[in-house]
Amino acid sequence: MYGKIKEHLQQELAEIKAAGLYKSERVITSPQRAEIEVAGRKVLNFCANNYLGLSDNPRLIEAAKKAMDNRGYGMSSVRFLCGCQDIHKELEKAVADYFGTEDTILYAACFDANGGVFEPLFGEQDAIISDALNHASIIDGVRLCKAVRYRYANADMADLEECLKKAQAQRFRIICTDGVFSMDGNAAPLDEICALAEKYDALVMVDECHSAGVLGKTGRGITELYDRRGQVDILTGTLGKAFGGAVGGFTTGRREIIDMLRQRSRPYLFSNSLPPAVVGAGIEMFRMLAESNELHDRLVANVEHFREGMMAAGFDIKPTQSAICAVMLYDAKLSQDFAARLQDEGVFVTGFYYPVVPKGQARIRVQVSAGHTTDQLDRCIAAFTKVGKELNVIK
């Protein structure tokens, strides 16, 4: 039997390779940080979600070791059997305190949080209205739910309003959006979304994965940026980006919503609890962020420094409020060649092109971190400038 599907898979894989879409893993032989080791050489890392530079933070590493010593290596159980330790509850409270919400539920990943949030809450008589550029995990979560589905053009409030008008016959309506869209780096217009939600009696859900730790005066995310703390019904997020970069996701928001997810959210009910090391480090991470805004302030300064340098060099940079800087190249092959040449120059980035982004919108996505020094940012800008001139992207 396998011989038949083997031939089919080999053909599909060959087509993926021929189209230049085959994904290869680039092996790192160092901790995740601003400068990493790849293929036996050191390179500057500008493609990680390590926004606050915490992935190799000594304080978090020590907290993880301490939690493992005191609470063990793993839980070997789901939460509602014997997989809930006191530190899991402590981390859930820390998340709620950070975002100004009523309660929190932890997941193995934010993919699980987004995948498990809709089906327990909404049914055939309800409507889910989702931004067209939402993350794949939201798309998959919506597919698992029987609610009527609407999709509006990215951050297009006129289109969103039309969807809300069409959904008025449904029992409940919920608007779902990424806080920051990962390919362009643009932030959702949450103030306008909330205004429309109030006008048309809809709930609001925001995925804070790329906005938490980044947006807002103190980095508390998009709800802080738009002065909507405690007003958004559902927030999802991850410990795998700004918050240390390990694993783990969460949903935080209205108390009754979180309670229902504990009863019926399948990824929560049928997945092991987060391991103590991750939980202990997460608690310490939120403690650090409560003590000081230094890392967030450094990130904001680094993003501004990098964007100004790149625009001065003549590059086309997408407008952004986040730590994601999309350097537009438009041509797919050029984006691949540019990324390869940058690695030769000691800068580790990735070129993105169709179907990850629309045709003719190829780019290199640069992700700035609080862990980058000014010298490292300048070296990155210099490398971009050198390669940009070689490939006739800039003069």
Q: What do these predicted regions represent?
A:
Residues 7-73, 202:
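N-terminal "arm"/small-domain region of PLP-dependent enzymes with the aminotransferase-like
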Residues 117-136:
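Conserved PLP-anchoring active-site segment centered on the Schiff-base-forming lysine
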Residues 78-84, 93-116:
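Short loop-beta-helix segment that forms the pyridoxal 5′-phosphate
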Residues 200-203, 210, 215-321, 334:
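Active-site C-terminal subdomain of aminotransferase-like
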Residues 3, 58, 62-66, 70, ...:
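PLP-dependent enzyme catalytic core of the Aspartate aminotransferase-like
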Residues 150, 154-206:
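Active-site phosphate-binding strand-loop segment of PLP-dependent enzymes
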Residues 297-306, 311-346, 356, 360-361, ...:
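Conserved PLP-binding catalytic core of the aspartate aminotransferase-like
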